Amino acid sequence: MKQEKAIVVFSGGQDSTTCLLWALRQFQEVEAVTFQYNQRHKQEIEVAKKIAAKLGVKHHLLDMELLNQLAPNALTRDDIEIEAKEGELPSTFVPGRNLVFLSFASILAYQVGARHIITGVCETDFSGYPDCRDEFVKSCNVTVNLAMERPFVIHTPLMWLNKAETWELADELDALDFVKNETLTCYNGIIADGCGECPACKLRANGYNEYMKMKKERA
């Protein structure tokens, strides 16, 4: 474990919760930051608070509702249908979201004396989101370091993992059931296994089933 401090960009979902658990194994002191941007499922905020409290992690909540004004999308507006047309970005894409989140997480890290920033973005299952790519994160890391003259390190533990491998990581962290039962991934705001119909639920369920099949075959 590094005797250093880390900030985790945290939504209360499967990926960011796995990252939070990973960070708790890696760093001496860990804090989490959640962004309120009028997301479609308001339960996300409450779930994030609950998980942070259960894990004994200091939790910051930042108001980012300006994103909803600048970038109307299916994650923030009930009147926009969740869909993904071939050759187009999904309607859940929020332009600049991860750029803004990582920038503000870096500002918070500066203020609390943290060097490490952890985000759960993933290029393997990135659904076409350009701000989930490894090259974007590396570019952002260089930018915030130049902007604040700090040697921040942005970590992406899930970058090259598919959903089955993300479940495997949760299991390696002795938290498979915790992540399965306590997190909120569903676009319709249903905790744990979710609605089973939205793209996020299907991706999550398929990954879980694939991992459990792999685990059984290894036994």
From Swiss-Prot:
Q: How is the cofactor bound?
A: Binds 1 zinc ion per subunit.
Gene3D superfamilies hit by this protein:
HUPs
Give the pathway. Purine metabolism; 7-cyano-7-deazaguanine biosynthesis
Q: Which reaction does it catalyse?
A: 7-carboxy-7-deazaguanine + NH4(+) + ATP = 7-cyano-7-deazaguanine + ADP + phosphate + H2O + H(+)
Keyword Ligase attributed: yes
Q: Which co-factor is required? A: Zn(2+)
Q: What EC number(s) has UniProt assigned to this enzyme?
A: 6.3.4.20
Q: What class of enzyme is it?
A: ligase
Residues the record lists as binding ATP: 10-20
Swiss-Prot/TrEMBL keywords: ATP-binding, Ligase, Metal-binding, Nucleotide-binding, Queuosine biosynthesis, Zinc
Homology family? Belongs to the QueC family.
Subunit structure, as described in the record: Homodimer.
Q: What is this protein called?
A: 7-cyano-7-deazaguanine synthase
Which lineage? Bacteria, Bacillati, Bacillota, Bacilli, Bacillales
Q: Which gene encodes it?
A: queC
